[in-house]
Design a protein with these regions (language model features):
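Short catalytic/ligand-binding loop motif for oxyanion handling, primarily in non-cytosolic enzymes
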Residues: 24, 41-43, 63-67, 102-103, ...
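Ser/Thr/Gly-rich flexible loops in soluble cytosolic domains mediating phosphotransfer, phosphorylation
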Residues: 55-82
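A structural signal for short, well-ordered beta-strand segments and their strand-loop junctions
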Residues: 15-18, 54-59, 93-95, 135-138, ...
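A short, structured N-terminal alpha-helical element that caps or precedes a catalytic domain
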Residues: 1-57, 62-64
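Canonical Radical SAM [4Fe-4S] cluster-binding loop centered on the CxxxCxxC motif
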Residues: 1, 6, 87-129
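Short glycine/proline-enriched coil/turn segments at helix->beta-strand junctions
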Residues: 10-12, 26-30, 50-56, 70-71, ...
């Protein structure tokens, strides 16, 4: 979506393909991109590279996952999205922050994005022609120094939010638990009140349940 937005802004025509191999009537493209999240997609990525040897491939599912969109387009933080390639999608999505305070061995976020920093306000993410429903893709919402400002924006703007990537429950404290309980949080479809968390390491059971109990005590079921 970011690449599509940037290319359209340059006057380019963009096609979204869902298969790695061209069809019989596929046109010739000036540039081809591919993205892989998981390692088990490597055979599919290889098919893409066989079909388009000059394809630019990124994502955490390939060996060299350090390639970023910003490097490809020669810009800094680029937080613009082309929703036209998913016309059925009616919400707004984006990041208010990048990076993470944790350094889990299995995760590339701290290696790729560094320490937490703010990149957008809630108002930056919202599409004014849509309902006030925001899917937040933040990996560590409370890791950014400006999280209190983001909370005020949610409340003052009467937004509903879905913290799609979950909350770092291991880093929850009484203040953040109380704040979460006061927010209109929902599942990714905005049909059910739901807060996502992750339990990535069984050895951290005590830390996990300490955070979970703080959420429960704050009124989050």
């Amino acid at each position: 979506m970011k690449l599509s937005h940037w290319h359209r802004a340059q006057g380019d025509e963009v096609t979204l393909a869902r298969t790695p191999s061209p069809s019989m009537f596929e046109p010739q493209y000036d540039r081809v991109y591919g993205s892989s999240i998981f390692g088990w997609s490597k055979p599919v990525i290889q098919r893409l590279r066989d079909a388009y040897p000059d394809a630019i491939v990124g994502g955490t599912g390939i060996d060299d996952w350090t390639t970023t969109i910003e490097e490809q387009i020669g810009e800094g933080e680029y937080e613009h999205y082309d929703y036209s390639i998913y016309p059925e999608y009616q919400f707004s999505m984006g990041f208010t922050q990048r990076g993470c305070r944790l350094n889990c061995g299995f995760c590339v976020v701290p290696k790729k994005e560094g320490r937490p920093r703010s990149v957008n306000t809630i108002w930056d993410i919202w599409r004014p022609d849509k309902e006030k429903k925001i899917v937040l893709l933040d990996n560590d919402f409370f890791g950014q120094d400006e999280w209190r400002q983001r909370v005020e924006e949610i409340k003052e703007g009467e937004f509903k939010i879905s913290i799609n990537q979950g909350i770092n429950v291991r880093l929850i404290n009484e203040e953040s638990a109380t704040v979460l309980a006061s927010l209109p949080y929902y599942d990714e479809n905005f049909t059910t009140r739901r807060l996502y968390t992750a339990w990535d390491n069984v050895g951290q059971e005590d830390i996990f349940f300490k955070g979970a109990n703080l959420l429960k005590d704050a009124g989050i079921p």
